[in-house]
């Protein structure tokens, strides 16, 4: 127990927050051009050194973890740890089995970068597709 001026303090070594990130916020701790996910938190949490574990694009919504625990964040994010991640996407245009095959081989990006192989499960395919 820790007390200051007779008042008990609650002390936690680490804090984890599960945030349903809305569109329009950057997955960053600070940015001079726009609002960040930390702006969505109460003031007391904003002062705890929290940072996003991963990244969702500004126009994307979904679950984002925030923490001040670097060790576990590293375990979740490091490509060497091979932690599976799952995303739900809605795209304009038809998804095909060729798209699934390209994901399975590893996508080739501009600049020569090749992504790790991934599974693409097509839920619906049409003018708008979901995977």
Stretch-by-stretch model annotation:
Residues 1-131:
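Basic, flexible Lys/Arg- and Gly-enriched helix-loop patches that mediate nucleic-acid binding at interfaces
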């Amino acid at each position: 127990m820790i007390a200051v001026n007779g008042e008990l303090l609650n002390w936690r070594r680490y804090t984890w927050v599960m945030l349903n990130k809305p569109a329009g916020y950057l997955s960053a701790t600070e940015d001079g051009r726009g609002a960040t996910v930390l702006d969505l938190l109460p003031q007391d949490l904003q002062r705890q050194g929290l940072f996003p574990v991963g990244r969702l694009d500004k126009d994307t919504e979904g679950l984002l973890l925030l923490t001040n625990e670097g060790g576990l964040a590293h375990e979740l994010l490091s490509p060497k740890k091979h932690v599976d991640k799952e995303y739900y996407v809605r795209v304009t245009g038809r998804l095909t089995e060729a798209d699934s095959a390209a994901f399975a081989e590893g996508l080739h990006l501009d600049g020569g970068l090749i992504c790790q192989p991934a599974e693409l499960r097509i839920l619906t395919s049409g003018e708008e597709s979901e995977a």
